Amino acid sequence: QGEVVGRLIPGESELAPALMFLADDTLETADREKAEARLQLWLKAHIDTLVKPLRDLEEGEGLEGLARGVAFRLVESLGILERSEISEDVRQLDQTMRAGLRKLGVRFGAYHIFVPALLKPAPSRLIAQLWALKNGSPDMPGLDELPQLSASGRTSIAVDPEISPALYKVVGFRVCGPRAVRIDILERLADLIRPLLAWKPLDPAVSPPEGAIAEGGGFTVTVAMTSLLGCAGEDFSAVLKSLGYRSETREIQRPVVAAPAEAAGAEVPKPAADDGSDPAPAVTASEDPAETPGAADDTSTVEVAAQPAAASAPT
């Protein structure tokens, strides 16, 4: 009938809150115990259903040794670990151990080890509420807003200084300077950047893909990257910097094409076939011909993001 019959209070862990039963004093002891047991059973089933991947990792079926330790760390951190926090353990995992963790829903990303299923709206909201119950308060700033923003499809949001950075992480965002970016979106960004960093100029006749630089070892920001994160300019640069990339300014050579002569009667040679290139400019002879700048180069600069020290493909 919509009446409050219980209240959650902090328990042994975030995933095991205690229940304060609020019953009418007229209830007899036996009836009260039955009602409380039923409520406890419902609460456990509700939590277990929404955070099933964490329960599976707790059980660790098929996991041994170091893999079980990684699973424990993931449960402890509610399904999200920055890769740098556990990099040594991850390096020591063999393929069998990795396969066992993947079978339980774990993804090994470039920046995070996480469980994507827990980023869905329902489990994400519940995990945030349980975390706040244990580590903050039910009315802490951002507890209602962050899960809503994540569920709305926002890939990044402006950081609110009133909201705890830990709460951003619990909901599935990573604070990157002035922006908080969803961790699954950061992994998609890594997927865009990785082939650009790996590109090498093996054949001078082959142009680099969009975003790669001719000499290799870096990349320039593309529209696909900024569209993915929903931010650009200084905010996007701050995101890259927080991930360990550094910005460099490099000179590039752009060929200057001489302007066509305007003298009357100048004959412009017709190309034999249209190959997609611009036609060569016509030059009119004179007694004192001016020097044609056709071979000159225009030097300009471009911002290039260089590879961070630890950047590599996730394994």
Predicted regions mapped to residue ranges:
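Acidic, serine/threonine- and proline-rich low-complexity intrinsically disordered segments
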Residues: Q1-G233, A238-V239, L243-I252, A259-A264
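Long, low-complexity intrinsically disordered regions
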Residues: P255-T315
